[in-house]
């Protein structure tokens, strides 16, 4: 029932959408993506390739790259193999599902995303998922974030992110609380 509701919410959006699998819904035999028809949603592209794949939203000049998660292990590199910026796109968005690892810190956690990888990425914006608390990862080299969760209050409120990418003006990122969810 929750999945069907979620699919309808996505289908009701007036814009193209992209999605990658995460650690709770890996691309496993008999998993959620085999039990429900995500491809039936006309405005959704589900990115599943283990090595990553590129989606083009030509009407907006946008290229989106992401990678399907088959197994949530320390060997899975969510940003590994990301291609350089395509020459003919106006905006380049990346998607990755894993745990942020700050500069100089080791990690034995599954699906690590090192800050150096974020800063070296060619994306105008990098959308990250894994933990439910919102986190901005903005430096002179990169703009990335975990948007948080619109359904729970880990970190003080249910949250979502608004990203504006302007051709000659850079990327603006704002994390907002869903009204009425602040826990103070």
Q: In which residue ranges do the predicted regions lie?
A:
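C-terminal functional module detector
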Residues: 152-184
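His/Asp/Glu-rich metal-coordinating catalytic cores
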Residues: 1-159, 164
